[in-house]
Amino acid sequence: MSIAQNNIGYRNKMIIGFKKYNGKILAGFYEENSHKIIDLDYCPLHTKEQNKIAQAIKNIIIKLRLPIYDEDRKTGLIRFALIRESFSTKEILVTIITASENFPARSEFVKLLRESSDKIKTIVQNINSRSTSIVLGEKERVLYGPGFINDELLDLKFQITSKSFYQVNPSQTVILYQTVEKLAKLNKNDVLLDAYSGVGTIGLYLSKKVKQVISVENNRQAVNAAIANAKVNQISNDTFILDDATNFIKNVDKKSLKIDVLVMDPPRTGSTIEFLKATITLSPRQIIYVSCGPDTLVRDLKYLLRGGYKIDYVHCVDMFCWTNHIETVVLLSK
């Protein structure tokens, strides 16, 4: 297991929820297994700059008298704030999540927010009108800057947007990806499928070791960022496909496309039976399963074992310090 050497201020992403209670605006995190907001002035898992900006957003909301969204009455405007920080370039993206597109004070909001930190490179409004606890909606509007920030990881450059899947612990991510590379034992003739690829981090990192990478991701914004990332890093052997991973792998013609190595990094909910069944049919030489959900990892591994694969190696990375979550890398082969 790779223990984190730095367990304070390690997160590059902060999500703040807002609630009005007894006339006071609360800004903080949800209490576990509830919709109760715990009002926080400072969280040690995040950087000083992220904490400073979070407090600035709260103060701006109070100053401009912006109405906080009430999930019971379905009224109000401000729902969440998302702060993403590059530890390499120090650039910061702030996304304000609103219940409707109408944001009357947005110009003043942007002005005051920019004055709070010179690290803020871009500000985005995300519109989420759904009655759900899911943070981000589908529609976005860039209020300031390019709509993304730049980050550097393992000698590669990446564009990060509000919707991009990107690991939250940069120093441990380096260890995670190096572990994947070490376990894969790739060669220059291999075709690698990077499923649930996000902004392309794993596939782009491994591209120098293989003949071809096929990266599949169902988020259009992430795919666009991945294409830009490949271009800026001058990588030409990684193909990016906008599709659901299950739908893609079910329709792969085994005769026309031979997948040698599968790298899969699904969400905490794990993969699908249809994806795993199609994987067994495709029969890649190796599967590297990267998981942040131990329960769903065990469930999916059982299916792959019944399909003829065996577990060669398991390695855990302490990605989420001070929580009961852990990142796991599993190498399987036939």
Regions found by a protein language model. Give the residues of each.
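Short, aliphatic-rich beta-strand segments
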Residues: 19, 83, 90-99, 157-161
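Rossmann-like S-adenosyl-L-methionine
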Residues: 105-107, 111-334
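Short, solvent-exposed loop/turn elements at beta->coil junctions and helix N-caps
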Residues: 1-7, 80, 84, 316-319
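Extended interfacial segments that mediate partner engagement and assembly in macromolecular machines
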Residues: 1-68, 88, 103
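Short, low-complexity Ser/Thr-rich regulatory SLiMs
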Residues: 18-20, 85-87, 318, 334
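A short catalytic or substrate-binding loop motif that flags glycine-/basic-rich loops and adjacent residues
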Residues: 6-11, 20-22, 73-75, 143, ...
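Short, acidic/hydrophobic/Gly-rich beta-strand patch recurrent on exposed beta strands
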Residues: 28-31, 95-97, 226
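Nucleotide donor/acceptor-binding cores
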Residues: 12, 90-92, 189-190
